[in-house]
Amino acid sequence: MARYTGPAWKLSRRLGISLSGTGKELEKRPYAPGPHGPNQRKKLSEYGLQLQEKQKLRHMYGMTERQFRRTFDQAGKMPGKHGENFMILLEARLDNLVYRMGLARTRRAARQLVNHGHITVDGARVDIPSYRVKPNQTISVREKSNSLVVVKEAIEVNNFVPEYLTFDADKLEATYTRHAERSELAAEINEALIVEFYSR
C-alpha cells in the first residue's frame, strides 16, 4: 500500500486525530468530512475499531503498510510487551526524531529534510527516513543546510523537545539519549487494538 499523499486535514478529521500535531484540523470541525456533518459517524465494529487504530498510528508516522507491518513484526521479536515495543521502534525512526527536535513542523516535512540529504547521524549523511536511531547517536543538520528557512521557521515555533533527546539549538543537533518510554508517547493511541488487528 502506498504512502498517503492526499489532504492531511481531511484525513485527520476522518481518523479523529491530529496528524500535524497542532490540533488545528479538529478545532472547527471535530468530525469526519462528508455531507452529513457531525451526525454521520456510525458505531464501529470490533474489527472497525482495530483497523481505525492501526490507520491512526500508521498515518501519524507517515508510513506505508509494508513498512508499518515490518516494524510491527520486528517489535514482536523483542522482550516485553509487543504493543509498547512497537510504539518505541516507531518513535526511533530518523524522520520522527527530526520532527521531535523541532527542525520541521510536521513529520512529512521532516521526512523531506531527510530525503533531501540535510540530516546527519554521528556526522554521516543519512537520507533514509526509516533509519532507526540508536541510543547515544547524535542527529544534526548538515552545516551547509543550517540556513534553510524551513528549519529556522520550525525552530522559532517549537517549544517542546522530549526528555529522551538533548537538543542544542545553536548547533542544530540532538543526542538520542535513550529509547522513549510508553508514558511519553501518544496517549490517544491504544496499541493493544493494533496487536489484536494483526493477530486476527
UniProtKB/Swiss-Prot annotation:
Pfam families documented for this protein? Ribosomal_S4 (PF00163), S4 (PF01479)
Q: List the disulfide bonds.
A: none
Could you tell me which CDD domains the record lists for this protein? S4 (cd00165)
Q: Which Gene3D superfamilies match?
A: Ribosomal Protein S4 Delta 41, Chain A, domain 1, RNA-binding S4 domain
A single Gene Ontology biological process assigned to it is: translation
Which segments carry the region annotation Disordered? 22-42
Keywords of the record, alphabetical order, are: Ribonucleoprotein, Ribosomal protein, RNA-binding, rRNA-binding
- Give the matching InterPro entries: Ribosomal_uS4, Ribosomal_uS4_bac-type, Ribosomal_uS4_CS, Ribosomal_uS4_N, S4_RNA-bd, S4_RNA-bd_sf
Asked if the keyword rRNA-binding belongs to this entry, the reply reads yes
Kindly list the GO CC terms recorded for this protein.
Answer: small ribosomal subunit
- Residue span(s) of domain S4 RNA-binding: 92-152
Does Kinase count among this protein's keywords? no
Q: Which PROSITE patterns match?
A: RIBOSOMAL_S4, S4
Question: GO molecular function, one example?
Answer: structural constituent of ribosome
Q: Which domain of life is it from?
A: Bacteria
Q: Which family is this protein grouped under?
A: Belongs to the universal ribosomal protein uS4 family.
Summarizing the function annotation, the protein's role is: One of the primary rRNA binding proteins, it binds directly to 16S rRNA where it nucleates assembly of the body of the 30S subunit. With S5 and S12 plays an important role in translational accuracy.
Subunit and partners: Part of the 30S ribosomal subunit. Contacts protein S5. The interaction surface between S4 and S5 is involved in control of translational fidelity.
Listed PANTHER family: 30S 40S RIBOSOMAL PROTEIN, SMALL RIBOSOMAL SUBUNIT PROTEIN US4M
Supply the HAMAP family for this chain.
Answer: Ribosomal_uS4_B
Name of this chain's protein? Small ribosomal subunit protein uS4
- Underlying gene: rpsD
